[in-house]
């Protein structure tokens, strides 16, 4: 009630149609409108579709109107770019802070808030609200694109007898490309990339545009999750009864216990469906996988 700044940092789970579910964001906005006692800056940290700030503003204003209150407030988009497994380090030393606001008052307050963590001025990036909301989706879609692109290159290399790792070194040494997110593998997973890529394609479609490249990124990733299983089938045959395979690493990312959309789930289920037995281990995620994602496997 006495805060100058209130953060909305809740989940936006993916709906059945691929869209982001805003019920938790708007529930918090409603609560803020019911309880605020003075001018407030409302900061949306959640990954939300473009235009969500307008819905948050309308929700808060409705509650204030019902209270017959003329309190002022500003809605700010401040997408988070924390990496799972390194959240504290990323928060303490962010590589950039993106602020979306049309209010000079809110912009200055946010600068003051982040100054101890972001003393280099060019790391504080201010823009309009919709652009800030889009920036989060664009960043995740770009990283997902790099992953799918490199997996495509690796698959082509295998057909041609080229070494994908050597190709990775060759292209990564180009400063315009760099080495981040160009390691061939079993595809991306986790709570962000799959959800955000789907949401962005849906947002585009709802606004009359077909995002062909981003759609292809998702299609490539879906196929890549089964590449390892397909290699095993090619080597051992369609029926894997009597075979036991060891899986080292289960989470979508090392050092975490996050099994959401982890490629290992798809590989294991495909092998088991063909009669194989699995012995799997992950120093962080074994318990999570067994309890919630691989029951009965």
What are the language-model segments listed below?
Residues 1-297:
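Structural/interface elements that position substrates and couple domains in central-metabolism enzymes
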